[in-house]
């Protein structure tokens, strides 16, 4: 079957919304690890500065805590659901889903790791950091 431009757009939109729904479902799923939820937007400058940090945390600390990014410009209801006042906002959750802390604004990797430790989560440096 030949895809017309309109059908191609439809397929792309369905794929995008399915992926977005899966990401949001992952944020709400009952976690087995502590979880960092970062609420931001793809075009927000401090949020863009957070992206490589979140990617690094996801790669190198996946066995210690999970990281979820939610773009609140693409998923407007999520900002209200989490009660954020500005972006980026980082929310730290325990493994049982209880909110432990939140931070508004840019947050450096060392500060995120320090916050986990302050909250009683034993965070160890990875033996060999994953390659970019």
Q: PLM features: residue spans?
A:
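Non-catalytic, surface beta->alpha helical segment in thiol-disulfide oxidoreductase systems
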Residues: 94-127
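Structural micro-motif
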Residues: 82-91
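Thiol-based oxidoreductase modules, predominantly thioredoxin-like and allied folds used
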Residues: 39, 63-76
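Non-globular targeting/processing and membrane-anchoring segments
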Residues: 2-3, 15-16, 116, 123-132
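Bacterial N-terminal signal peptides
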Residues: 10-21
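Typically the conserved alpha-helix immediately C-terminal to a functionally engaged Cys/Sec
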Residues: 48-60
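Short pre-active-site segment immediately N-terminal to redox-active cysteine/selenocysteine motifs
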Residues: 35, 40-43, 86
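A short beta-strand-turn-helix
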Residues: 23-34, 76
